[in-house]
Each structure stands twice: as structure tokens, then as C-alpha cells.
């Protein structure tokens, strides 16, 4: 994508929120112009934790469209100059002071990720998502369950989560799953998204998710939940 974009004189950036922390990245090697990502998914920062921004060094001299005092040249931030001088790196796109509590959580998580190694994390992630896909196929792929997989079967095209699809009652089934302590989400029109985290989830927990889904259908437990969607699903 980057190569084709540059061949047509197009700047290209990527949202890496669903890949950072579970997939290796080499943004410099790929010559990506910019990228951004949150830290509350696989980086385990929690709600409100800091966002991150990558800027290719060839764009360090660009003037940020939205400037803030924290993007000023770091060694002169407190000079209170009238003229804005952007830091000549990704820091030039910072706007204000980062939240310290959110940063603290991310710092601890990054230390664990570094110790584990992103290649090892990716290897376990592929095994976990493949295991989940195989279980859904074997246990839930027939009537009356009627679940299917929406994610790519080829792991090289798959990220860290698996989209489990069901034409009917996917939302209420996801709510029944949450009631059993499974953190999942629903995406219209028919997707239940499961995202095992290699750092702390286990294969046994994946097995439990699939058999929770089986029991939810066997016992019609989803009927205990409203069809009206919450604002956050």
C-alpha cells in the first residue's frame, strides 16, 4: 500500500490501534509517512491512556496543522516566546501534557512486552486465534449454532482478534457472553469480536468462550437480553 501510494505521490498513514502490541511493526523500513495508535488495547494502558504518533523523519520539518505548547522545541518550552517553533521530530505534533496516570500504566506494560518479545507475542497470538477459529468450526459451525468466521483464515492476513459471525441474534448473544464474564464486543450487523491477549489470556479461556456460546444457544440464554443496543456494545 505504501509503495503504491508513493508511486502516485500520495502521503499515506495507518491506524495501528488493533495491531500494536500484538504484531511486529517496521514503519521506518516500510517508509510509512505517519501512523497513530491508542494504548488501551494490546498495550494494556486502560481507558484514557495516552495515544501514540509516528512521523517519518522526512516530514520532521513540516508545520503541524494543530499546534500546542507541548509541541514546541523541548529545550525552549518555557521561554514563553510569541513565535511557535515546532520540535523537529514527532514531538512537534504533541499538543498538551500527557496524562501521567495513563502513561504509568503503559510504561509498565511496555516493559513486560519488551521482556516477552513482540515476535513471541505474535507467535502465541496466531496460535490462539487459530485455536479459536478451529473450535468455532468444529463446535459451533452447524445447526442450531450457525456461527461462522469472518476473519481471514490465513494468519498472515489476520490481526489479533477474531470476528465470529451469526446472522441472527448476534447482539443479544454477545450480551449473554458478557454476563458470563467474557469481554467481547458487537459490531453491526452480525459480528461478535473476540480478542485474546497473548500476555495474559490462556487457551483454556478460549475453550471456555466457545462452550459458553454453545450453552447460550442450547439454553436460549440470549432471550433474557433486550434487542435494544447500548451506546457502547
Predicted segment positions?
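Catalytic PLP-binding core of fold-type I/II PLP enzymes
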Residues: 1-34
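Structural detector of well-ordered beta-strand residues that form the stable sheet scaffold
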Residues: 13-15, 36, 150, 185
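Phosphate/diphosphate-binding loops
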Residues: 18, 37-49
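Short loop segments at secondary-structure junctions
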Residues: 40, 55-60, 166-169
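Active-site C-terminal subdomain of aminotransferase-like
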Residues: 44-49, 54-124, 130
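Conserved PLP-binding catalytic core of the aspartate aminotransferase-like
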Residues: 126-130, 137-180
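PLP-dependent enzyme catalytic core of the Aspartate aminotransferase-like
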Residues: 168-169, 176-233
Amino acid at each position: 500500500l505504501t509503495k503504491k501510494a508513493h508511486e502516485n505521490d500520495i502521503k499515506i498513514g495507518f491506524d495501528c490501534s488493533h495491531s500494536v502490541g500484538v504484531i511486529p511493526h517496521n514503519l521506518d523500513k516500510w517508509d510509512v509517512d505517519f501512523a497513530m495508535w491508542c494504548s488501551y488495547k494490546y498495550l494494556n494502558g486502560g481507558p484514557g491512556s495516552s495515544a501514540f504518533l509516528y512521523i517519518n523523519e522526512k516530514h520532521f520539518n513540516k508545520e503541524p496543522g494543530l499546534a500546542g505548547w507541548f509541541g514546541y522545541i523541548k529545550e525552549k518550552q518555557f521561554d514563553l516566546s510569541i513565535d511557535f517553533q515546532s520540535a523537529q521530530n514527532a514531538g512537534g505534533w504533541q499538543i498538551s501534557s500527557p496524562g501521567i496516570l495513563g502513561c504509568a500504566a503503559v510504561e509498565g506494560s511496555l516493559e513486560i512486552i519488551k521482556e516477552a518479545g513482540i515476535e513471541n507475542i505474535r507467535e502465541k497470538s496466531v496460535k490462539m486465534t487459530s485455536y479459536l477459529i478451529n473450535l468455532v468450526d468444529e463446535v459451533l459451525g452447524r445447526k442450531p449454532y450457525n456461527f461462522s468466521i469472518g476473519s481471514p483464515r490465513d494468519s498472515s492476513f489476520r490481526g489479533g482478534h477474531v470476528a465470529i459471525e451469526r446472522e441472527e441474534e448476534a447482539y443479544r448473544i454477545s450480551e449473554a457472553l458478557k454476563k458470563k464474564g467474557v469481554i467481547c464486543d458487537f459490531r453491526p450487523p452480525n459480528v461478535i469480536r473476540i480478542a485474546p491477549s497473548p500476555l495474559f489470556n490462556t487457551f483454556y479461556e478460549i475453550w471456555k468462550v466457545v462452550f459458553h456460546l454453545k450453552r447460550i444457544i442450547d439454553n436460549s440464554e440470549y432471550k433474557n437480553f433486550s434487542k435494544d443496543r447500548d451506546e457502547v456494545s
